[in-house]
């Protein structure tokens, strides 16, 4: 009598990471872009660089062409504001779902339930390479210990989401990632699980993963010293206000960790209303302008077109508009970035 795979329909071969990396290699110029951006973000986390990290981009990438157009626009602004902001494009290919729904470009690149994951991995890597060649750093959320083998060499900053921060697997994964990683507070608003995650990820771990050849393996990590908390609000309301920020910074100090936080202007902090993101950003900017050194970064959900659309007919989607969470349109995004840059300049004067 069969006792295994009773609920499994099929298991298809996964492209080995080494094959995809050989097919779409990172150039020497590109490796310099990634390494330099990671170092810059690390210096900001350590307080050696007084700029602000800004993770800005679509809730999720569903159309690489629109993503690349957004990147070209963002790269120009990143150059303009580079003395005050280290802008990193949010490039999320995987979407954790509360129940069910489209799980992202890697999982379902054709948006039709065909789940051609090998092609999704190829599209994701190609877009990240395009961004690197533009000179624009990228930030991704990681949902499993396998996908990073295909794309992590191209990523400047990583995120562990609110639904997975408490997961041992994701803390172990973060301990081995080659870039700074942010842990979001839980969906209930609890910050302690993110603080615990930062502590855990700083230590060495052993866990199951895959090699570049696609074989199952036992991964041994050194621990990641460049992890931090992301405040994203929760069921009990937002936590971007001064009192919440100071409470979190104090909790980090009590835990023996660096007092540094990134703040997400979306999700629970905007009450899931994308139009509130500029107001949230203004509040954060005011705290920065008053001299607060513990705020090291801000996250914004932004795309070419304001709002969102349902994935009903993939042939008639609005170009440049999100199919997951609603985003700020480009015209509303640029003033927010300028406001944050002005806040950094004000903080610089206060702290001189």
Model segments located where?
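Active-site-facing alpha/beta catalytic cores
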Residues: 2-5, 84-240, 244-245, 267-268, ...
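N- or domain-start disorder-to-order transition segments that initiate the globular core
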Residues: 6-48
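Gly-rich Lys/Arg/Thr-decorated short loops/hinges at beta-loop-alpha junctions or inter-strand turns
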Residues: 17-25, 221-235, 317, 321
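Conserved phosphate/anionic-ligand binding catalytic regions in large, soluble enzymes, centered on
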Residues: 53-66, 325
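Conserved, mostly hydrophobic/aromatic
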Residues: 57, 263, 329
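Glycine-rich loop at the start of a catalytic domain that most often binds anionic cofactors/ligands
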Residues: 64-76, 99-107
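A contiguous, surface-oriented mixed alpha/beta subdomain in the mid-to-C-terminal portion of proteins
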Residues: 232-234, 239, 247-262
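Internal helix-turn-beta structural module
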Residues: 303-348
């Amino acid at each position: 009598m069969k006792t295994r795979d009773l609920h499994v329909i099929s298991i298809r071969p996964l492209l080995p990471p080494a094959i995809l990396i050989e097919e779409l290699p990172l150039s020497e110029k590109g490796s310099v872009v990634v390494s330099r951006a990671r170092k810059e973000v690390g210096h900001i986390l350590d307080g050696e660089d007084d700029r602000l990290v800004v993770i800005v981009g679509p809730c999720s990438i569903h159309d690489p062409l629109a993503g690349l157009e957004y990147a070209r626009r963002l790269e120009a602004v990143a150059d303009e504001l580079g003395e005050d902001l280290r802008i990193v494009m949010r490039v999320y290919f995987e979407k954790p779902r509360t129940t069910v729904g489209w799980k992202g470009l890697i999982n379902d690149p054709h948006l039709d339930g065909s789940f051609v994951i090998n092609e999704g991995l190829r599209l994701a890597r190609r877009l990240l390479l395009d961004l690197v060649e533009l000179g624009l750093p990228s930030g991704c959320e990681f949902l499993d210990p396998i996908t990073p083998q295909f794309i992590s060499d191209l990523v400047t900053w990583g995120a562990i989401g609110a639904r997975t921060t408490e997961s041992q697997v994701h803390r172990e994964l973060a301990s081995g990632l080659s870039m700074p990683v942010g842990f979001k507070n839980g969906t209930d608003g609890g910050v302690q699980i993110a603080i615990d995650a930062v502590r855990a990820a700083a230590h060495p771990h052993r866990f199951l993963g895959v090699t570049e050849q696609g074989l199952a393996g036992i991964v041994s990590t050194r621990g990641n010293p460049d992890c931090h908390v992301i405040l994203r609000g929760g069921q009990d309301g937002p936590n971007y206000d001064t009192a919440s920020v100071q409470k979190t910074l104090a909790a980090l100090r009590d835990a023996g960790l660096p007092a540094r936080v990134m703040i997400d202007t979306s999700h629970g902090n905007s009450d899931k209303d994308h139009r509130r993101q500029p107001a949230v950003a203004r509040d954060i900017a005011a705290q920065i302008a008053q001299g607060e050194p513990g705020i090291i970064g801000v996250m914004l959900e932004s795309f070419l077109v304001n709002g969102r659309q349902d994935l009903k007919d993939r042939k008639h989607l609005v170009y440049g508009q999100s199919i997951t969470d609603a985003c700020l349109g480009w015209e509303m995004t640029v003033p927010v970035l300028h406001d944050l840059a002005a806040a950094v300049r004000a903080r610089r004067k206060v702290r001189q």
